[in-house]
A protein has these predicted regions:
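Charged, amphipathic alpha-helical linker segments immediately N-terminal to NTP-binding catalytic cores
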Residues: 1-4, 202-262
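Pre-Walker A adenine-sensing motif
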Residues: 8-22, 269-283
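Residues at the beta-strand->loop junction immediately N-terminal to the Walker
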Residues: 19, 32-33, 290-295
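Pre-Walker A (Motif I) flank of P-loop NTPase domains
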Residues: 24-29, 285-291
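Conserved P-loop
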Residues: 28-30, 34-94, 296-366
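Structural recognition of the conserved hydrophobic beta-strand(s) that form the central parallel beta-sheet
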Residues: 58, 127-129, 156-166, 322-323, ...
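Phosphate-binding/switch loop-helix module in NTP-utilizing enzymes
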Residues: 94-155, 360-425
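Phosphate-binding/switch region of NTP-binding enzymes
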Residues: 163-217, 429-491
């Protein structure tokens, strides 16, 4: 039998209700979905989620066991295989006894091997991928009888039985099995979105009937529904300026940027690649990115997301001018940076804010008046940019600004005639954050990238509108009470 090695469980995640269901001692589960929706990937992920090291029987009617390992490279880290020769039946039977190549098998002989497994091996888990291919050789009466026999033997053996089916309209198994999930793929704003629907999980309470998931890197991963409380900072004892706290609780950075790059094209290219967006080498150097944020998303979520990007540029010794989103004080902003920092904050970070009351971090703040007009704030921005450029020459300059603070409704033209041209000329990478709906179509035509942070089916998504690209799901984990987000491409 195969055995599994240790691996990070965060890479694989199935919905909590389904996880609770598959942990039961015995059950039958039907996984429905059209071709390419992820049935095989989910089945293999369930094996890993249950930490199955032996005593399983995977029947493949579509692919050879060898091809499974080619299509799912991560299996190589879990399943130990020794001296497997595909053309050597004896080796295949001994080394791959857990994976059965049933592409050429007659239904009768295959059905007999399944029942033998149920009778001879105590409490096995059997995955039939797919049941359609086997059942298609049976007439209706024989199929119903065989399905009942499998269920009976499954109960007697205390086994777990998983079927996959590509015919969502076929309901012959529906009343027999204990659980039914269906995988679907839909187009949303030119991007493919995958969902898993929990139709029936006998004995398990279904709190959420559907989840968005991805098959990125051949791994099934679903995403929990949006919960603002996950983005609260609960550990106030961690000091973001403390070298010890930074080294002990540092998490991975979001973008793998080159440490010695002096060309902003490389930075922007890698941002584009991390979001699966096409990057053009013909466009001008300085870039402007507009990120629209759904108003229902809390300031903590926005800050946690932007902190990932800002921290990466800080780690590459770039100059950063950032403006905290409304509702976030400078101290809290620095707290959100904490999971990603690997060294002490230096003079390369400047925060635009209306208050310098926190004396411990006042050195990072450039103050402006609470009653300042957008023109006065723009003037202050130019002063800060000039100061940073004079103090730290030949360094990349990135800015993150709240667009709403510079959008003067009495002088709508200033945004395009003054601010946008200034950023284009003086700032290597400008991120404009809009909490309110963008009022000017002209603005959209003047940016290089348009991203949208919003909720879809109660899941946090980052969409790429300009240029067209894959959507990304946001998930959060915590490092001693501080939230840290990750971005996963939805494919």
């Amino acid at each position: 039998m195969a055995s599994f090695s240790k691996v990070d469980d965060n890479l694989m995640q199935i919905p909590p209700e389904l996880m609770q269901f598959v942990k039961r001692d015995t059950y039958s589960l039907l996984v429905k979905g059209n071709s390419g929706t992820g049935k095989t990937t989910l089945s293999l992920t369930i094996l890993r989620a249950l930490e199955i090291r032996s005593n399983f029987f995977y029947i493949s009617t579509r692919l050879s066991p060898r091809q499974l390992f080619v299509n799912y490279p991560w299996l190589e880290k879990f399943v130990v295989r020794e001296n497997i020769e595909v053309n050597d039946p004896s080796n295949q039977r001994s080394s791959l006894s857990s994976f059965e190549d049933a592409r050429l098998d007659e239904p009768e002989s295959l059905f007999e091997r399944i029942t033998n497994q149920l009778m001879d091996v105590k409490a096995p888990i059997i995955i039939i991928d797919s049941w359609d291919a086997i059942a298609s050789f049976m007439d209706t009466e024989a199929r119903l009888n065989n399905e009942r026999v499998l269920q009976t033997w499954r109960e007697r053996a205390g086994a777990k039985l998983i079927f996959t089916s590509e015919d969502s309209e076929d309901n012959t198994l529906d009343f027999l099995v204990d659980g039914i999930v269906e995988l679907k793929q839909k187009v949303y704003r030119n991007a493919d979105i995958r969902q898993i629907f929990l139709a029936k999980l006998r004995g398990t309470k279904i709190n959420r009937s559907s989840y968005i998931f991805t098959l990125n890197n051949g791994v099934f991963k679903s995403y929990n529904h949006y919960d603002p409380s996950e983005f609260l900072i609960t550990n106030k004892r961690i000091n973001p300026l403390s070298k010890r706290d930074r080294s002990e609780h540092k998490t991975s950075s979001p973008l793998d940027l080159p440490s010695n790059s002096s060309n902003v094209k490389k930075f922007t290219r890698i941002i584009c690649e991390s979001l699966s967006i096409e990057f053009s080498h013909e466009v001008q150097e300085n870039k402007i990115v507009l990120i629209e944020v759904d108003p229902v998303i809390t300031p903590n979520v926005c800050t946690s997301f932007f902190a990932k990007i800002i921290a990466q540029f800080l780690s590459n010794d770039s100059n950063i001018i950032a403006q905290p989103v409304p509702g976030i004080e400078p101290r809290l902003f620095l707290d959100f940076l904490q999971p990603y920092l690997s060294r002490k904050l230096g003079k390369n970070l400047r925060l635009l804010h209306y208050s310098k009351n926190d004396t411990e971090i006042s050195e990072f703040i450039d103050e402006y008046g609470t009653q300042d007009t957008s023109s006065e704030r723009f003037k202050r921005l130019k002063e800060v940019v000039s100061k940073v450029q004079s103090q730290r020459k030949n360094k990349i300059l990135m800015s993150m600004l709240i667009l709403d603070d510079f959008d003067n409704r009495s002088d709508g033209d200033s945004l395009f005639s003054k601010i946008i041209p200034f950023l284009r000329l003086n700032v290597d990478l400008s991120i404009l954050v809009s909490i309110k709906p963008v009022r000017y179509k002209e603005l959209v035509r003047n940016v290089d990238m348009l991203l949208r942070l919003n909720l879809l089916h109660n899941t946090l998504l980052l969409e790429s509108i300009i240029p067209d690209g894959h959507s990304h799901a946001l998930s959060v984990h915590r490092s001693l009470g501080v939230p840290a987000v990750t971005l996963d491409c939805l494919v």
